[in-house]
Structures are given as C-alpha cells and as structure tokens.
Amino acid sequence: MASSDCEGHAGQEGETFLYFAYGSNLLTERIHLRNPSAVFCCVARLQDFKLDFGNFQGKMSERWHGGIATIFQSPGDEVWGVVWRMNKSNISSLDEQEGVKSGVYVVIEIKVSTREGKEITCRSYLMTNYESAPPSPQYKKVICMGAKENGLPQEYQEKLKAIEPNEYKGKISDEMEDIIKKGESKLS
C-alpha cells in the first residue's frame, strides 16, 4: 500500500482530479488498464451509502458476467474505497469505462472521509436503472483483491468476502483473467 497522497488536496484542482473507486477499480492493475495516470491517494469512507451489485436495465454485464458494483444512499451504512488522483486527460476514458454515454452510470460528486477524518471531494459513479444481481466470482475476486492490496479496513474486507457471487464458471476477458493472475501472485 502506498503512502497517502491526499494531504493538502481537498478536491478537483489544476490538472488532476480525485476519483473514489469502490468496485473493480480498487485494484491498481485494473484501473491502470485504461487510466495509467491513476496514483493511489488514500483509503476513504463514503458515509450513508451502501454497496450493491446490479445489471443495468436488467442486462448482465458482458465483460463480467454478473452484477457490477454501484452505490445507493442508505443512512447509517458506509462504503470504503480508494481515492485515486488522476490526470484530467483521463476523464473521458474513465467515463467510457463506466458507460456514462450509454447511461449505465452517472457522474456524481461526493464527499468522503479519510481515516484521519479529513473530508475530500471526489468524482464517482452511480448506476442508474438497475436490477440487483450478484457479481460473478471473478468480479468479486477483483474487488476483494483491490481491497486487500490497498488496506481497506479488515471488517469491510470480510463483508466483501461474504458477498454471495453468482454461479458463473466460464471465462471473462483474457485481459481481466491476466489481471486476476497477476494480482493473486502479488498478494500471496
């Protein structure tokens, strides 16, 4: 886990922006596929939101073969994630990855708290028009690997591990399979 790079950076300034990741982009290898400028900033908590998994308009993700991560407002709950500092030149690739143009996710601005209690404004994404559905085992694994790699609180990691995946046993993309293999060897 890298040291915190959030000090003195309260929001979207200059040539960079802060992005709060709570799904597959928790894993460094995953976010770097399309967004090589991403630099670990810190672990943070989004208060009064809850993690969910779903299929946009009821259609299963062709990339992940199951529900994909989203968040929704839920008083008293919390979502832990990673804040990445990224070049503004990566906004379009991040939006594309998240399906903003096709309406899968909408961009939201949120305030998250660091472990030290500092509040930071970040860009994040919220899925619209979805039906709850379990993630594939592979998608869940990528999220759990990212949580471990970046030192999310152990209790939250246990919650992630307890998520029941669907029963998909096939392959996902070669690119993602490679990322899982690299991550497993790095984290073992």
UniProtKB/Swiss-Prot annotation:
Active site per database record: 98
UniProt-listed GO biological process terms: release of cytochrome c from mitochondria
SUPFAM superfamilies: Gamma-glutamyl cyclotransferase-like
Family annotation (Pfam families): AIG2_2
Binding site residues for substrate: 19-22
Documented EC number(s): 4.3.2.9
UniProt keyword annotations, A-Z: Lyase, Phosphoprotein
CDD domains with a match to the protein in the record: GGCT_like
InterPro entries: G-Glutamylcylcotransferase (IPR017939), GGCT-like (IPR013024), GGCT-like_sf (IPR036568)
Family: Belongs to the gamma-glutamylcyclotransferase family.
Subunit structure: Homodimer.
Protein name, UniProt field: Gamma-glutamylcyclotransferase
